[in-house]
C-alpha cells in the first residue's frame, strides 16, 4: 500500500467540488472524484462528469479515479468508499460537498423536495462518513470536511430544506469531532461563499468576480491534510477571507412564573450583547460580499 494520502470528494465534478479535488491533488493526494453528474435540482445524471475531473488531474500528473455512485443512498456511499479502498487500499480524508437545490417557500414546498435536499446534503454526508469511518480511524490522521452554509447558520428565505440540512451538518460536526478525537480524527465544516451554479443566480456580478471557488479550496486542502490540528470548527470562507462561526449563549437569567414576566425575559434575551448578530444569511454575507466586490 502506498504512503500517498487518499481523499474522496463528493460532488467533485463541478464548482467547489472540482476546485477541492484539484487542490487536494496539488497537495499530493490521490483523489476519488464522486459525482452522479445530476442537474442542480438533483435530476438526471452524467457519469462522464466525474471522469472528466479525474482525467484533468491525471493529465496534470496527479492520481485520480472517478465514481458516479449516488451517495445519497447507503449502498451508493458504501460503493464510493469501496472504490477508493479497492483502488488505493486506504482512505484518509472525506470531503462531503455533494448538494442540490429545490428552493421554494415552506408553505409551497412539496415534502418530496424537502426530503430530497436533506437527503443529498445531510444524509449523504452522514452515509459517507459512516462508510469511511473504519478507514479514517485506521489512517491515524483521518480527516472529514463537511459543507455547511450561512443559510443554515442564519436562515435564508425560501431555503427551509437547504438550511435545515446545512445546520444539521453543524450538529454532526460537533458530535463526530468528539467521537473521533481519541482515534486522531479531525472533523470540521466550511460554510463557503463562491461563484458556482448554485450561487450565480443569487449574487451580484461584481461580487461573483471576487468569489472564485479556488479561493475556498486551500482551506479545504488543509483541513483534509495530516497537518490539520483543529477539530470541531465551522469556518465561513470565501473571497480569500475566513472567519470562525460559533454558537454563543447569553448570561443565564431567572425565569419568572408569570406570563408577563416570561415575555419580558424573552424580549430581553432577544437582544444579546457581544459578537456580531445577523438576522439572515444575506446579512451575514454582506461584509464578505463588500470585500469581494472590491477585489480586482
Task: For each feature predicted by the language model, list its residue ranges.
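Canonical Rossmann dinucleotide-binding motif of NAD(H)/NADP(H)-dependent dehydrogenases/reductases
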Residues: 2-33
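A glycine-rich helix->loop->beta "capping" turn
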Residues: 3, 60-63, 83-96, 102, ...
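The beta1-alpha1 cofactor-binding region of Rossmann-like NAD(H)/NADP(H)-dependent oxidoreductases
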Residues: 47, 51, 68-79, 111
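Substrate-binding pocket helix/loop in short-chain dehydrogenase/reductase
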Residues: 57, 105-106, 113-115
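Active-site helix of classical SDR
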Residues: 129, 165
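Residue(s) in the substrate-gating loop at a strand-loop-helix junction
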Residues: 149
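C-terminal helical subdomain
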Residues: 189, 207-294
Amino acid at each position: 500500500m502506498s504512503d500517498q494520502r487518499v481523499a474522496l470528494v463528493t460532488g467533485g465534478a463541478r464548482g467547489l467540488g472540482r476546485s477541492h479535488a484539484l487542490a487536494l491533488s496539488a497537495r499530493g493526494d490521490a483523489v476519488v472524484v464522486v459525482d452522479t453528474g445530476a442537474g442542480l435540482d438533483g435530476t438526471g445524471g452524467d457519469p462522464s462528469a466525474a471522469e472528466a475531473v479525474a482525467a484533468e488531474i491525471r493529465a496534470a500528473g496527479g492520481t485520480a479515479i472517478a465514481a458516479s455512485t449516488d451517495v445519497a443512498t447507503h449502498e451508493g456511499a458504501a460503493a464510493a468508499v469501496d472504490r477508493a479502498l479497492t483502488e488505493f487500499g486506504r482512505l484518509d480524508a472525506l470531503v462531503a460537498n455533494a448538494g442540490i437545490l429545490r428552493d421554494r417557500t415552506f408553505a409551497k414546498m412539496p415534502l418530496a423536495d424537502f426530503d430530497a435536499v436533506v437527503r443529498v446534503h445531510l444524509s449523504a454526508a452522514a452515509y459517507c462518513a459512516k462508510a469511511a469511518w473504519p478507514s479514517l480511524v485506521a489512517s491515524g490522521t483521518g480527516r472529514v470536511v463537511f459543507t455547511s452554509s450561512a443559510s443554515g447558520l442564519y436562515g435564508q428565505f425560501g431555503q427551509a430544506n437547504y438550511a435545515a440540512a446545512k445546520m444539521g451538518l453543524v450538529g454532526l460536526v460537533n458530535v463526530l469531532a468528539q467521537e473521533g478525537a481519541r482515534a486522531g480524527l479531525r472533523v470540521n465544516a466550511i460554510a463557503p461563499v463562491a461563484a458556482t451554479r448554485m450561487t450565480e443566480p443569487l449574487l451580484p456580478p461584481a461580487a461573483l468576480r471576487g468569489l472564485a471557488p479556488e479561493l475556498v479550496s486551500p482551506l479545504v486542502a488543509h483541513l483534509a491534510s495530516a497537518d490539520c490540528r483543529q477539530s470541531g470548527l465551522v469556518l465561513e470562507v470565501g473571497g480569500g477571507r475566513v472567519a470562525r462561526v460559533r454558537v454563543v449563549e447569553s448570561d443565564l437569567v431567572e425565569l419568572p412564573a408569570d406570563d408577563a414576566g416570561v415575555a419580558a425575559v424573552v424580549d430581553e434575551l432577544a437582544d444579546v450583547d457581544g459578537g456580531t448578530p445577523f438576522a439572515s444569511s444575506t446579512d451575514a454575507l454582506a461584509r464578505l460580499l463588500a470585500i469581494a466586490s472590491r477585489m480586482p
